[in-house]
Amino acid sequence: MGTEGVRTDRLSILLEQFDKATDMARARLSGLGDEEYLWEPVPGCWSIRRRDEAVTPQAFGPGEWVLDQGDPDIPAGEYAEVARQAASGMSVEKIAEDWSVSVARVEEVLAHTGEPEPDDTPLTTIAWRLSHLHYEFAGGWEWAFGERRQDPKQMVDFTPSAAVALERFWETVDRWRTAVGGVTEEQLDTIGFSQYPYGSDPDDPFVGVIAGANLEFVHHMAEIALLRDLWRVRHAWSGR
């Protein structure tokens, strides 16, 4: 494979990774309809719902449709991340603030030994996963390049229309991509360049925030792709 003309600086590598991921995601989401977008493969899924039909205690959103969310907790799959935060010198109090849980809950996680119990977090719909990504990228832009004042969870008007959701989502993603493309080397290394209020962004160099955004995008798009595959064959396996 030739490498002539290929840039290998940190930002270019991250942007190339993101661009390839978004190209694949755009193709993978082609033809998404409303029924598939809102499809609940099993009972008890988290999704987007009308505000007066919300089934979770912390559902949020600025409009008629809200995104399901349960009470704050640290899922078993994130125990290793909490241990990493503690090992890096982050205080228990700060970890608790990042996860919106009590200090006692963080101490319980850090004291855990052996394999964590399986997570009981409900399965989520394509609508939930796409909406989750949408508000994170909207908030990511706001708290790094915008006015740093809007609550990310109130920035996206969730919709039951797949076409409308995708149009708005890609506009948000494109705005993030354009802004990140102009970041300087100094800004990449600036701790707190992003003040995103949920998570550890204010304590991280911005290069780590960008890498984390890439990972979050790939992670959720892979889940959406699998749900699309299951939707396509749903009649075959539902009768077994």
Language model region names:
Residues 74-90, 105:
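Short, amphipathic alpha-helical "recognition" segments used to contact nucleic acids or chromatin
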Residues 104-112:
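Short, charge-rich amphipathic alpha-helical segments embedded
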Residues 94-98:
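Short alpha-helical "recognition helix" segments of helix-turn-helix
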Residues 157-193, 205-218:
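Acidic/histidine-rich alpha-helical segments that form the ligand environment
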